[in-house]
A protein has these predicted regions:
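Glycine-rich phosphate/nucleotide-binding loop
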Residues: 9, 115-129, 208-298
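Glycine-rich phosphate/diphosphate-binding loop of Rossmann-like nucleotide-binding domains
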Residues: 39-43, 51-55, 59, 136-191, ...
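Active-site rim loops that border cofactor/substrate pockets in soluble metabolic enzymes
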Residues: 78-82, 171-231, 319-323
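C-terminal non-catalytic interaction/assembly regions of soluble proteins
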Residues: 244, 250-383
Length: 383
């Protein structure tokens, strides 16, 4: 009889908490390391209390105590970090939010921001960590990491855009090959007049894609700017932080914030972590990696590595006689621009290089444009 009464009491308590927080069911248990912030430990505890009101069972690791939050007492930051790792490893908590963590190569974090133009939420893949030592391979993997995180957050078919940084066009070509192989995802379209899936700064501000793909250093800068632009930079006030570490076979839920993160952002990071628990992020990850590999991911990455090897020295190619260059072909990586022009010279087509508002261009006569495009596509310079 006592067990029945306890069960009924627990059920009514969960219902009451659900009505108060708007979140029903078992609360995800998320640890927060509170020591080490540039804004003091009170800032972290304030965040813990805010998240607790939103349906997160917060385990605060530090020296402060407050009603509604479970405190795990530690004496210093290092002890707190070790305690957090123990709790995650043992399953005492479902995940953790912390200011630093040594992710292995192949794992990087997917941040989440609120974009200023229209208030849209956008995932940035990625923001810390290293998906690969190779830039293009890393951005290909980052795309999958971003899709995983967005799907675990409840977006069934997230749109993907690539920031116009070095490697964007090669990443786009590789992802189109993956798409042709059967991996399902949807491209975002730039809000700029020329469209396309390679996006510009305007698209970042507007939140054009659900998932913005870039290298992690660029992503880190974007997170900092979008979370702290209204405060002068010392206090990250908006957004959800640098996000969870995602990688193949990696099943520890660790979310990253920074020492400059303010209470509102840390609270959002705790909610973000809870959303990943509810969305079964690691089950989603296993399915997405399996689907990508079935579509030829490993072969695409292997081809990318082979293409990145230094080519054997060739005889110097001389330019054909000059002629007016009235046509142009975009979409070539800036590092490949000169080689692309020489590939056309070798075929007897006079070409010049330039930089348009959308990026690098190879220019030639209108009469040679179609043939030049075929040559560049065959050589792998354009998709």
């Amino acid at each position: 009889m006592m067990n029945l009464e306890q069960t009924i009491a627990k059920t009514f308590l969960q219902m009451a908490e659900g009505l108060e927080s708007g979140s029903f069911g078992v609360k995800p248990k998320i640890a927060l390391t509170g020591m080490g912030s540039e804004h003091g430990e009170k800032n972290a505890m304030e965040a813990a209390l805010m998240a607790a009101k939103k349906g997160v069972d917060v385990y605060y690791i530090g020296t402060l105590e407050a009603e509604g939050v479970t405190t795990i007492k530690v004496e210093n930051e290092d002890e707190g970090h070790k305690k957090m790792e123990e709790m995650v490893e043992s399953g005492e908590v479902d995940g953790a939010v912390t200011m630093h963590f040594p992710f292995p190569i192949g794992v990087s974090t997917v941040g989440k921001v609120v974009t200023p133009a229209k208030g849209r939420e956008m995932f940035i893949a990625t923001t810390t960590g290293t998906s690969s030592a190779d830039r293009i391979e890393g951005m290909i993997k980052n795309t999958i990491y971003g899709i995983i995180t967005a799907k675990a957050s409840g977006i069934a078919d997230p749109t993907v855009g690539i920031l116009n940084v070095d490697g964007a066009r090669q990443t786009e070509m590789a992802l189109n090959q993956l798409k042709e192989g059967g991996y399902q995802f949807s491209w975002a379209t730039s809000a700029r007049a020329d469209g396309g899936a390679v996006l510009r700064g305007n698209d970042v501000l507007q939140g054009t894609p659900d998932v913005l793909v870039c290298d992690s250093l660029t992503g880190n800068v974007l997170i900092k700017m979008l979370s702290a632009y209204s405060t002068g930079g010392s206090f990250e006030a908006t957004g959800y932080g640098y996000g969870p570490g995602i990688g193949k076979g990696y099943h520890k839920l660790i979310h990253i914030i920074s020492r400059a993160s303010g209470a509102p952002l840390i609270a959002n990071a705790l909610v973000y972590a809870a959303d990943m628990v509810r969305g079964k992020v690691f089950e989603v990850a296993d399915k997405e990696f399996a689907a990508a590999e079935k579509a030829g991911l490993d072969k695409i990455l292997a081809a990318r590595k082979a293409a990145a090897k230094p080519a054997e020295a060739e005889d110097e190619v001389k330019a054909p006689p000059a002629e007016p260059c009235t046509a142009s072909i975009p979409g070539i990586e800036v590092m490949d621009l000169e080689d692309a022009a020489k590939a056309l010279w070798k075929a007897g087509i006079y070409a010049e290089t330039g930089m348009g508002c959308t990026g690098p261009l190879v220019m030639m006569s209108e009469a040679n444009k179609e043939k030049a495009a075929e040559i560049l596509k065959k050589a792998g310079y354009i998709g």
